[in-house]
Each structure stands twice: as C-alpha cells, then as structure tokens.
C-alpha cells in the first residue's frame, strides 16, 4: 500500500507567496522559496505551486521562483497556473518541476492532456478540477459541476464525467478542489472526493477546506484520496507538516515519517 501524502499548496503572485479565500482577497504572506524549503524540511511529501498572475512579465518572475525552488528542495513539486500549451509545460519542467498542473486550459482544450502525456509521460500531467456543488440535473447528474477561471465560469460539465475523460486522455493524477470548501477550514468535501476516487483509478488529491489534521485524515480515509492538499493551516503556523503527518499516522494512515 502506498503512503498517503501531505502536499502544501503555495499560490504565487508576482514572485510572492499569497493566500485568499475562495480565490479572492489575496494577501502577501512571504517568500515562496523560503516557505518551500521550510515545508520540505518539515516532511512535506510534495509541494504544489500555482502562478496566479497572468502577464508575460510575471511568468518570467515565476519561472525564476521555480528554478530557485528546485535548488532548495529534494521532493517532487508541481507547477500550475497559466499553462495552456505543451511549450508552457516544457518551460516549467525544464525549470525544475516534476509535474505540471493544468485546469481551465484542459477544460477548454482537452487534447492538451494527451499532448502533455505523450510529450512528458502521464506521471508529469496533473489535471486540476475546480468543482461547485449544484442541484442534480440531467446535465449534471452527480450534483458537482466543473467551473473555471477561479470558479467564476460554470461549464455545464459534470465533474465525474470529466474525471473519467481526463483519465482516458492520459492524465496521471487529479487534484479535486471544492470551490464551496476552499479556504473555509471546515473540512474537505468528502462526498465529492470519494465520488471522484471511486470513478477513476488515478490518484486523487483532495483540495479545499483543511482546517486541522483530522480533516486530512478524513480525506485519505473516508474520502478515498491519495493525498491531502493544504495551505492556510501551515502558511499561518497553526500546524506544522510534521504535526499533521504524525496525527494521521497515529490514527491509522500509512505515512512517510522521515524528517
């Protein structure tokens, strides 16, 4: 059995670490390279970086951050945000990332998933899914709809159907983010995570809502996730990565406990 993973998520704007709630109200909370190094030393299994700026100038700043991170940490890390082509994927992988995460671009152009997998291998392609709970309907039978642009645009696409499509196209992993739970610290949307995990054979990362280690344990047990993505609870010093992993291990989750 594979160990469950704890993955801190770092949103980067203009080269600085930032954090908001439900994709708004972002504030500067530090240096992403220093934070990545600290999380690596605390025992993070992987790290995810999202570039939440869109300009070409900011992209150059972000790639510099990626290169500096690659010099400081020795665990896998993935990069997302603004990746809309195989050339974009190549740029972040050459900068030192092990994986790329694509979200809105994959919804708009599903072929990008397969193109990326063909070029770099499925293991390098993570598809991020931003999901909104909606009333069940013939169009959205699961009651979970894919949204893009930070949750601002609904796509009329059922999340379960999209997860299966991503697997068929060659994705190596899915990161499932609940828009409703994001930043609330009230716990993950376990029903959503479980539904996706049951629908595909890919590893599923639970995202959105972690407020304490118990929530992370719930995600990888009842939620069926392979990993728990966290942000606020470690960025603001409420818990350390080590505390989270030790709690999960003490309550039955298989964890990598090396520091």
From Swiss-Prot:
| Pathway(s) | Amino-acid biosynthesis; L-histidine biosynthesis; L-histidine from 5-phospho-alpha-D-ribose 1-diphosphate: step 5/9
Where is this protein found? Cytoplasm
Q: Which domain of life is it from?
A: Bacteria
Q: Which Enzyme Commission number(s) are on file for it?
A: 4.3.2.10
Catalytic reaction equation(s): 5-[(5-phospho-1-deoxy-D-ribulos-1-ylimino)methylamino]-1-(5-phospho-beta-D-ribosyl)imidazole-4-carboxamide + L-glutamine = D-erythro-1-(imidazol-4-yl)glycerol 3-phosphate + 5-amino-1-(5-phospho-beta-D-ribosyl)imidazole-4-carboxamide + L-glutamate + H(+)
**InterPro entries (alphabetical):** Aldolase_TIM (IPR013785), His_biosynth (IPR006062), HisF (IPR004651), IGPS_HisA/HisF (IPR050064), RibuloseP-bd_barrel (IPR011060)
**What is one Pfam family matched by this protein?**
His_biosynth
Entry's Gene Ontology BP terms = L-histidine biosynthetic process
Q: Name one GO cellular component term.
A: cytoplasm
The active-site annotation reads 11, 130
Top enzyme class: lyase
For this protein, the record's Gene3D superfamilies field holds: Aldolase class I
PANTHER family assigned? IMIDAZOLE GLYCEROL PHOSPHATE SYNTHASE HISHF (PTHR21235:SF2), IMIDAZOLE GLYCEROL PHOSPHATE SYNTHASE SUBUNIT HISF/H IGP SYNTHASE SUBUNIT HISF/H (PTHR21235)
Q: Which NCBIfam families match?
A: hisF
Known partners and oligomeric status: Heterodimer of HisH and HisF.
Q: What does this protein do?
A: IGPS catalyzes the conversion of PRFAR and glutamine to IGP, AICAR and glutamate. The HisF subunit catalyzes the cyclization activity that produces IGP and AICAR from PRFAR using the ammonia provided by the HisH subunit.
Q: Please state which protein family the record places this protein in.
A: Belongs to the HisA/HisF family.
Report the protein name in the record.
Answer: Imidazole glycerol phosphate synthase subunit HisF
What gene does this protein come from? hisF
